[in-house]
Amino acid sequence: MIQTLADMRRDYTRDGLSEANAPDDPFGLFRQWFTEATQTEQAPVEPNAMSLATVDADGRPHCRILLLKALDDRGFTFFTNYDSAKGQQLDASPYAAMTFFWPTLERQVRIEGRVEKVTAEESDAYFQVRPLGSRLGAWASPQSQVIRDRAELERLLAETEQRFLDKAPHCPPHWGGYRLLPERIEFWQGRPSRLHDRLDYRLVANGWQRERLAP
């Protein structure tokens, strides 16, 4: 029997999230959860995969999956083509939201805030540790632009490979990182009967304010 969408569900059984076990600083809790996710989640789940939501000039939302590539006390860093659709949207409206979901742990983290470009030095440092194919692809692909077919993309890649045949590809000027500076971070822990735990951290004048939200 084919299961209908209305019947598709699972119950959550793991331990809850209490204020007593949650630090005052959300970065500490995120690092703890992220470490546990890297130790627990298995392929095909990528623990650093996240959905990134942006809005265009008309206020229409757009969402896609990216990988978190750096985390410090300033915020959450990802890299992309600055000329891509997301890059243009962030130029027009420098705010975004990201969501991490770790199904084995039955956890979700939502993050909202302002976005800024990282320094050229930070972008270059990460670019240089990427696999060669990824570095060549950053030069070859006119991301988010219409191309005729796959053959055109492969032709662009072949031309790029010839261009860098005798030298290592450097970081393109149209490619680099963004850092999301969080103003709100919500931690969600699945619980039985859909009575989930939600702890919401909001940045206020004197630090972070933590509140519990109804599921």
Swiss-Prot record:
GO molecular function: FMN binding; pyridoxamine phosphate oxidase activity
Disulfide bonds: none
Task of the protein: Catalyzes the oxidation of either pyridoxine 5'-phosphate (PNP) or pyridoxamine 5'-phosphate (PMP) into pyridoxal 5'-phosphate (PLP).
Cofactor, free-text remark: Binds 1 FMN per subunit.
Organism field: Stutzerimonas stutzeri (strain A1501)
Gene3D superfamilies: Electron Transport, Fmn-binding Protein, Chain A
EC id: 1.4.3.5
Gene name per UniProt: pdxH
Pathway: Cofactor metabolism; pyridoxal 5'-phosphate salvage; pyridoxal 5'-phosphate from pyridoxamine 5'-phosphate: step 1/1; Cofactor metabolism; pyridoxal 5'-phosphate salvage; pyridoxal 5'-phosphate from pyridoxine 5'-phosphate: step 1/1
Pfam families membership: PNP_phzG_C, PNPOx_N
Protein name: Pyridoxine/pyridoxamine 5'-phosphate oxidase
Binding site for substrate: R9, R10, D11, Y12, K69, Y126, R130, S134, R194, L195, H196
Catalytic activity reported: pyridoxamine 5'-phosphate + O2 + H2O = pyridoxal 5'-phosphate + H2O2 + NH4(+); pyridoxine 5'-phosphate + O2 = pyridoxal 5'-phosphate + H2O2
Cofactor: FMN
Residues reported in the UniProt entry to bind FMN: R64, I65, L66, L67, L68, K69, F79, T80, K86, Q108, Q143, S144, W188, R198
UniProt record similarity statement: Belongs to the pyridoxamine 5'-phosphate oxidase family.
Keywords: Flavoprotein, FMN, Oxidoreductase, Pyridoxine biosynthesis
Assembly and binders: Homodimer.
InterPro entries per the UniProt record, alphabetical: Pyridox_Oxase, Pyridox_Oxase_CS, Pyridox_Oxase_N, Pyridoxamine_oxidase_dimer_C, Split_barrel_FMN-bd
Lineage of origin: Bacteria, Pseudomonadati, Pseudomonadota, Gammaproteobacteria, Pseudomonadales
GO biological process, one term: pyridoxine biosynthetic process
